[in-house]
Design a protein with these regions (language model features):
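Conserved catalytic core of sirtuin-type NAD+-dependent deacylases
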Residues: 1-238
Length: 238
């Protein structure tokens, strides 16, 4: 076992107040591409940039194209949790982990068994009619063609925070609470460039910050442990 992984294992073994803050890199080992990696969504060629196609304006003005892109690129219904998701769920069952705070919208943490999951950017698994509020599962979106419609005729919109939309204030407040109270804070699979989510790290008051990310990022945060590598492979050793 690598010395840095051994150090992280010592921190997590000794703690019963771990909080995990994760991004797209947590799900890449489940086959879901990271937006910003070399082979991620932002480096693929589309008619419009992905951040345009995933914006509230595009949803309003090019609704059918929005859903075509969303179905093709944002839904990964066959994806399964990897070792990182499973380890976090295991820690929660053991009473060690207090919360998972995620920027991901894929629902894999819940699929792995995690209960206290704060989804900063929403979830593809939840969808609501914009007219009557009726709930729909992700299958309704996946199986639809064109613009998905409710039985009342309204548009079914995913519970996903699009560009230009604001984050849920209640979810943000709960995330701040958990981070502020944390003994060990693990940041995994995120380049910390998406705000306001990335700004949550400033609320951590402890001295046991660990960063697991391909390409690093921990030194600038003053992390106690920085591990450059795939998070699933790392967490499988903890």
């Amino acid at each position: 076992m690598d010395d840095t992984i051994r150090r992280l294992k010592e921190l997590t073994d000794a703690s019963d107040n771990i909080v995990f803050f994760g991004g797209a890199g947590v799900s890449t080992e489940s086959g879901i591409p990271d937006f910003r990696s070399v082979d991620g969504l932002y480096h693929q060629k589309f008619k419009y940039p992905p951040e345009t196609m995933l914006s509230h304006t595009f949803y309003e003005t090019h609704t059918e194209e929005f859903y075509d892109f969303y179905r093709a690129k944002m839904l990964a219904l066959d994806a399964q949790p990897n070792a990182a998701h499973r380890k976090l769920a295991e820690w929660e069952r053991q009473g060690k982990l207090k919360a998972v705070i995620t920027q991901n919208i894929d629902g894999l943490h819940q699929k792995a068994g995690s209960q206290e999951v704060l989804e900063l950017h929403g979830s593809v698994l939840r969808n609501h009619c914009t007219r009557c509020g009726k709930f729909y599962g992700v299958e309704r979106i996946a199986e639809s063609r064109g613009i998905p419609r409710c039985t009342c005729g309204g548009i079914i919109k995913p519970d996903v925070v699009l560009y230009e939309e604001s984050l849920d204030e209640d979810v943000m407040a709960r995330a701040i609470h958990y981070i502020r109270q944390a003994d060990v804070l693990i940041i995994g699979g995120t380049s910390l460039v998406v705000y306001p989510a990335a700004g949550l790290i400033q609320y951590y008051r402890g001295h046991k910050l660990a960063v697991i990310n391909k390409g690093g990022a921990g030194s600038s945060l003053g992390a106690a442990v920085t591990i450059d590598g795939p998070i699933g492979q790392v967490m499988a050793q903890l």
